[in-house]
Structure formats: structure tokens, C-alpha cells
UniProtKB/Swiss-Prot annotation:
Gene field: dapD
Enzyme class: transferase
Domain of life: Bacteria
Keywords associated with the record: Acyltransferase, Amino-acid biosynthesis, Cytoplasm, Diaminopimelate biosynthesis, Lysine biosynthesis, Transferase
One GO BP annotation of this record: diaminopimelate biosynthetic process
Name of protein: 2,3,4,5-tetrahydropyridine-2,6-dicarboxylate N-succinyltransferase
Any GO molecular function: 2,3,4,5-tetrahydropyridine-2,6-dicarboxylate N-succinyltransferase activity
Broad class of the protein's primary localization: cytoplasm
Protein's pathway: Amino-acid biosynthesis; L-lysine biosynthesis via DAP pathway; LL-2,6-diaminopimelate from (S)-tetrahydrodipicolinate (succinylase route): step 1/3
Record text on subunit structure and interactions: Homotrimer.
Length: 401
């Protein structure tokens, strides 16, 4: 039977109507009662690029064309109905025994088995007859055309399936609706206003945690590595990436926006703005800010290299190479004027061959962007910004990571 399944997949992939996916998965959606907009789309399993193309063949051959809710060259959203569930299970017959006995096996089958339970318990649709489960297929990385595709891209970033800054997130703010979040549930703001009196009189008014277009990171996924620590769930937005283990985020002034994050072991007590990528081994001190691209006119995404130290309350508006230090309270922006003495310039030139010498020893911050081994400091006697070759080795406390 397994060979029959393989032949089915192979034949489908060679057919004229086969279209290779960038990503696909089944999502459960939350629908606003008044506007009917999608407030949230939750994917228990995300298949990215060439992952699980057998399940892609199953899903595409189980859907009903009349159930297509949205279709374009770049994405497709299809309603899950009874026919889809039963057809998919029939295709999956060779693997069902293993899936029933091991919940960690065949994750896409596990999703369909949960859909079967929803079918049996009459939960495929809400009380208004609207489908709560959708098959979502992303074909091309184009601007987001639906909430479902926006959530798929954010999840791909958070899981590390797509590198930070690699996906087209244009239009994402227009697709997502501002909602009141209580626990993992989004509430339509207009619905809350309309029903405020009744909800409060019956003591059913939800405890609202926050209002935003984005859910929090921990509301959508479990970190893949056990040594990732988030001490305050409100400080990390969905769409952030926290690396391959050892990331620690302290409470207080720390924050990570979507499409930003750390690549590995990192101590973060500061703010990692949108599109910022932080290298492994870097320590971001309390209240330190790394500027992003969402506002303020900065269109150049910032990267922080490996084994850097951003001191408390520092501001970094340029990219840093490996082994850099920005002292506490120091602001380094693209237009900042920084003095480098001639002997220190020679030391920096040893690790930055492209560095160009200025006769007056003054350099703009943007000229030092991405350079390795630079230590930025404010001269306490005259207030000048200075830079010199960093000789301090940045080592994180291994017991904390």
C-alpha cells in the first residue's frame, strides 16, 4: 500500500496541473462576529518548501473546488469540509496505524485526525455556518493577500524555516486587524463595545491582556530548544526568531519585534527592533536599543555581529561586525561623527581591510557600519564620540544559557 501511495504522489507531481508550493498547512481561524474578518490563523503544522510533499498531494486531491475561498497566482485558501477530511484519511490509510499509536509521527495526519474529531463533534463550522478550518497554500513570496498567508509567513520566520528578512511582508499591517487578546483568544473591538453592558452585567467581560494586530510569540509556537528562556511573554512578537538555543530574554526593557531576532546564544535585556538580526554570543544590556526599519526613516536593516556587547541604554543605528562594543549610554547613528586616533585606525585596519583613512581622523557612523572589532565610547572629558580597536573578549555566562 505504501508503494501505491508513492506512485500516487509521483503521478500527481508529474501531472500538468501540479503547482509546487512555497508553503502549505491547515489553519484554524478566528472570525470577527460583526465584520467577518479573520482575526487570527493558527497552524499546528507548517510545511515549508519541499517538506512533506506527499501530504501536499493528499490535500490537493482532497479539496473541493467549490470550497475555494480565495485564489490568486501567489496563494490559495480553501474551506475544509467533511469530504476533504474523509478523502484525506482514505489517502493516508497506509500510515494510520502508526499515526494512532505515535502522536509524534506523521504530523499532517495528526492534523487530519483532529479534523475528524471536529467533524464528529460538529465543530468544523461556527454557529453562523462559517468554516473554521482552512487549507492554505502559498505558491510565491508576494505581498500578503490574506490573514492566513500573513500568519503562515510569520510562523515560517519564527520557526526558522525562512531566514529573517527573506520574506515579502508588504501589506501585512493592512491585512491584520487590531484585536483585543485575552489568553489565546482575539476579540473584535467593535463586538466588545456593542456587548460591553451585557458582558459586564453577567460577569463575562474578558480579561484583556493587550490590544494589537499581532499575537505574542508564545501564543503561536513552542520554542524548539529547551534552553530558550522568555521571562515575560509580552516581550516577543509573533514573527520573531530566537535562534538555535541558548537565547535568554529578561523582563523589563527587553523586546523583540517581528522579522527580527537572534541567531543563537544571546542575553537580551534590550530592544531588538523590526528587521534587526543579532549574532550568536551577543549581550544586549538593559534598555539598549537597536533601531529598526518600521519608522523614523531608516531603510537599512541593521545586523549585529557575533560576540558583541551593547551597553545599558545604548542606541545602535548602524550595523556592527563581530566583536564590537558600544559602551553604556552611547548612541551610534549613521550620521554620528566619531574620532579614531591614527594608531587605533591601524589596529582596526588589520581586521577591516576596506576601511578608508581620513586625514582629520573623523568618521561618520555609516562608514563604520558592519566593521569588526570596534569599541565605541564617549570621551568623559570632552564628550566626543571615539572608537578604537576592541580587545575585550565578550563571553556570556554559560550557566545562564
Amino acid at each position: 500500500m505504501i508503494n501505491k501511495f508513492k506512485n500516487f504522489v509521483s503521478n500527481y507531481q508529474q501531472s500538468n496541473h501540479y503547482k509546487e508550493p512555497l508553503g502549505f498547512g491547515i489553519a484554524r481561524v478566528d472570525i470577527a462576529p460583526i465584520s467577518k474578518k479573520i482575526l487570527c490563523a493558527t497552524y499546528p503544522v507548517l510545511n515549508w518548501k519541499d517538506e512533506n510533499l506527499g501530504s501536499y498531494a493528499v490535500f490537493c486531491n482532497s479539496l473541493s473546488k467549490e470550497k475555494i475561498l480565495k485564489e490568486s497566482a501567489s496563494e490559495r485558501v480553501i474551506e475544509i469540509d467533511e469530504s476533504f477530511v474523509l478523502k484525506a484519511l482514505d489517502f493516508y490509510t497506509p500510515f494510520l496505524n502508526e499515526a494512532y499509536s505515535n502522536k509524534m509521527a506523521h504530523k499532517n495526519i495528526q492534523v487530519v485526525l483532529e479534523l475528524l474529531k471536529a467533524l464528529e463533534e460538529n465543530r468544523l463550522k461556527n454557529s453562523d455556518g462559517e468554516s473554521l478550518y482552512r487549507l492554505v497554500i502559498l505558491y510565491e513570496d508576494k505581498p500578503c493577500e490574506s490573514v492566513e498567508s500573513a500568519y503562515m509567513k510569520l510562523l515560517a520566520l519564527s520557526l526558522g524555516k525562512a531566514p529573517l528578512r527573506s520574506l515579502n511582508l508588504e501589506g501585512i499591517f493592512n491585512q491584520l486587524s487590531n484585536a483585543a487578546w485575552s489568553g489565546n483568544k482575539p476579540y473584535e473591538l467593535e463586538w466588545l463595545r456593542m456587548n460591553e453592558v451585557a458582558l459586564k452585567m453577567r460577569d463575562h467581560f474578558p480579561s484583556i491582556d493587550f490590544i494589537d494586530k499581532f499575537p505574542r510569540y508564545l501564543m503561536q509556537l513552542i520554542p524548539e530548544f529547551d534552553n530558550i528562556r522568555l521571562l515575560d511573554s509580552s516581550k516577543t512578537r509573533f514573527g520573531a526568531y530566537l535562534g538555535t538555543g541558548g537565547y535568554t530574554q529578561m523582563p523589563g526593557a527587553s523586546y523583540v519585534n517581528f522579522n527580527a531576532g537572534a541567531m543563537g546564544v544571546c542575553m537580551n535585556e534590550g530592544r531588538i527592533s523590526s528587521s534587526v538580526v543579532v549574532g550568536a554570543g551577543t549581550d544586549i544590556g538593559g534598555g539598549a536599543s537597536v533601531l529598526g526599519v518600521l519608522s523614523g526613516g531608516n531603510n537599512n536593516p541593521i545586523s549585529i555581529g557575533k560576540n558583541c556587547l551593547l551597553g545599558a541604554n545604548s542606541v545602535t543605528g548602524i550595523s556592527l561586525g563581530d566583536g564590537c562594543i558600544v559602551d553604556a549610554g552611547v548612541a551610534i547613528l549613521a550620521g554620528s561623527v566619531i574620532e579614531i586616533e591614527e594608531n587605533e585606525f591601524k589596529k582596526l585596519l588589520e581586521v577591516n581591510s576596506a576601511l578608508e583613512k581620513h586625514a582629520n581622523n573623523l568618521y561618520k557612523g555609516k562608514e563604520l557600519s558592519g566593521k569588526n572589532g570596534v569599541h565605541f565610547r564617549s570621551n568623559s572629558q570632552n564628550g566626543k564620540l571615539i572608537a578604537f580597536r576592541s580587545v575585550k573578549k565578550i563571553e556570556l555566562n554559560q550557566n545562564l544559557h
